Design a protein with these regions (language model features):
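Short, surface-exposed beta-strand/loop "edge" segments at domain boundaries and coil↔beta transitions
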Residues: 58-60, 129-131, 164-168, 203-212
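Short gly/pro-enriched beta-turn/loop segments at secondary-structure junctions
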Residues: 139, 149-153, 182, 191-194
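A compact, surface-exposed functional segment
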Residues: 103-144
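Intrinsically disordered, low-complexity coil segments
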Residues: 14-22, 134-135, 164-181
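N-terminal glycine/threonine-rich, aromatic-flanked beta-hairpin/loop signature
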Residues: 169-212
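Conserved small/polar residues in nucleotide/adenosyl-binding loops
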Residues: 213-220
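Acidic/polar, low-complexity intrinsically disordered N-terminal segments immediately downstream
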Residues: 1-89, 93, 97-99, 111-117, ...
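Tryptophan-anchored aromatic micro-motifs
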Residues: 151-171
Length: 220
């Protein structure tokens, strides 16, 4: 994924083929995460893969990327005391198969979608297991950025939206705005619930980046 984080898109509510809730009700969903057995030949025996929460890697990534700007940190869906995500701690991959699907369950009810929610996972190593986790960290660990979607979320054209900057106020207290509108080619709608989305104001978005450049100046 981009910079160590993989975007995962799941429906806000999972439905079956008849349109009924498939995971117990509105705001509940799931995602089947592929787990692979690597090697030059097919997997010769049953392998029970053990999966665990990985708060340490998320903490390292947050500090490396944002340092003391804790308001920008990714939030951990799997943190103790939260019920937004669950998953089995082990997965059986049968002999002759090279892939298993770990069933991640999500409960989006009452979650604050303005936060950047992720689920950090890792494949666990132990001498008693009949496998070895891949030595490359990005093969044995995953930080999943969870994006729920509904019928209204996604990208919309932003060319018709007017965004002006207030530079001051006149003598009557009316705002003085810039003549030109700050435009953005598209805006993204993020899920609140089954029928509701929100967007970020102006040109700012979750992944908005401002680059500052400096040039050396001659000494006096």
């Amino acid at each position: 994924g981009s910079k160590g984080v993989t975007n995962i898109y799941v429906p806000y509510s999972r439905h079956d083929a008849e349109g009924n809730y498939a995971e117990g009700g509105e705001g509940r969903s799931n995602y089947q995460l592929p787990i692979l057995v690597s090697g030059s030949t097919d997997n010769p025996s049953n392998v029970t893969v053990h999966v665990a929460h990985d708060a340490d890697t998320l903490n390292i990534l947050n500090y490396a990327r944002y340092a003391t700007r804790t308001e920008l940190y990714y939030e951990d869906m799997g943190a103790e005391g939260l019920a937004y995500a669950s998953y089995p701690e082990s997965l059986l991959i049968k002999a002759g198969e090279n892939k298993g699907l770990l069933d991640l369950k999500f409960d989006f009810r009452n979650i604050d979608m303005s936060e950047k929610w992720v689920l950090p996972l890792q494949i666990v190593d132990d001498a008693s297991y009949n496998y070895v986790a891949h030595p490359r960290k990005d093969y044995a660990k995953a930080i999943l950025r969870i994006f729920p979607f509904n019928d209204y979320s996604g990208d919309y054209s932003g060319t018709g939206i007017t965004n002006k900057v207030v530079t001051g106020y006149d003598g009557d207290g009316k705002p003085i705005e810039t003549a030109e509108s700050i435009t953005k080619s598209s805006i993204r709608g993020y899920v609140i619930d089954e029928q509701t989305i929100f967007t970020y104001a102006g040109i700012v978005d979750e992944d908005y980046t401002c680059l500052l450049y400096t040039s050396p100046s001659p000494r006096d």
